[in-house]
Design a protein with these regions (language model features):
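Short beta-strand elements
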Residues: 112, 117, 248-272
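Boundary/junction segments of secreted and surface-exposed precursor proteins
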Residues: 31-85, 90-94, 269-272
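Short amphipathic, basic-aromatic surface patches that mediate peripheral association
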Residues: 64-67, 77-140, 150-158
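C-terminal region of N-terminal signal peptides and the immediate post-cleavage residues
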Residues: 18-34
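N-terminal export and membrane-targeting signals
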Residues: 1-12
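Exoplasmic/lumenal beta-rich domain surfaces
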Residues: 146-147, 155-230, 241, 269-271
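Beta-sandwich strand segments
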Residues: 33-42, 46, 52, 90-96, ...
Length: 272
């Protein structure tokens, strides 16, 4: 192991800017305003601050690969969907967890600086050591509530009017699963691996690089909304960062939807 010198330590600190501010209550008690993630000014949308940063921008693709599942919950009918969280900003979405409880971590967002290194911003996001079951690999350090599955009633103009159901899934990884938008700024190989599975680790880093996606297939654990007994036209919505605890360039691309007719009989039988 390389011996740390005072010069090495000083160099490490010079590569990082730490931004500290007070934060209000957890998003569990109510989402923050999109214009003020975590209840503070967004450095990625402050003109002066953003000039010095390579800010991330996550986007959510429309729900896809949808199908009915009558087996996962006895006596119920659920509509499954694939989600694709796309990283399309100036820099990667990177978050760093630091253990503060037995099975959870607080989260700091690391945003690349144009001059090199990172600026670190505390957030109200949380990581948890979460079990998805043996079939899906056991337990992982995952992000809480980065994406919600929502089902909305719509009017005759397809505008969402009332939230009627939500999906059960709460925990996701941020990782480089598939390079979906290659570009000169997009790394050719994955930088951020699958989520850490060590329950004893004190620190973890999760992220998604520019041009890469974190995709969960419709067959995966809890990728569904219960649609039992519902009839008519609805918007099947994927809502990215619903608590507004991540800093990014644009919050307007954090919602996608697909109009569906229930009972579900496939994409060609909507009539909405």
């Amino acid at each position: 192991m390389r011996k740390l010198t005072l010069a090495t330590i000083a160099a490490a600190f010079s590569a990082v800017t730490i931004v500290v501010f007070g934060l209000p209550g957890s998003p569990a008690t109510g989402a923050f305003d999109p214009d003020r993630p975590n209840g503070v000014e967004d450095p990625c949308r402050n003109v002066q601050t953003a000039k010095k940063l390579l800010c991330p921008d996550l986007r959510i693709a429309r729900p896809s690969e949808m199908y009915l599942d009558r087996k996962v919950v006895p006596g119920r009918v659920v509509l499954r969907a694939t989600n694709d969280i796309r990283s399309r900003g100036q820099g990667p979405m990177e978050i760093r967890g630091h253990r503060d409880h037995t099975f959870s971590m607080n989260v700091t967002q690391a945003i690349q600086r144009r001059a090199g290194g990172y600026a670190l911003y505390p957030t109200q996001a949380r990581l948890r050591f979460f079990t998805v079951g043996y079939r899906w690999g056991g337990s992982y350090w995952k992000v809480r509530d980065p994406l919600h599955f929502e089902l909305w009633r719509i009017d005759e103009k397809r505008r969402r009017t009332k939230l009627v159901r939500t999906g059960p899934k709460q925990f996701y990884c941020f990782r480089d699963l598939e390079r979906t938008n290659p570009s000169p700024r997009s790394p050719a190989a994955a930088v951020y691996p699958a989520c850490n599975q060590n329950p004893k680790v004190r620190h973890v880093t999760l992220g998604t690089s520019i041009g890469w996606s974190d995709i969960y297939p419709s067959t995966y654990h809890l990728q569904w909304i219960d649609v039992t007994g519902l009839r008519g036209c609805f918007a099947y919505v994927l809502h990215l960062d619903p608590g507004n605890v991540l800093f990014e360039l644009d919050k307007e691309n954090n919602v996608s939807q697909r109009i569906v007719r229930l009972p579900w009989r496939g994409y060609r039988h909507r009539g909405c």
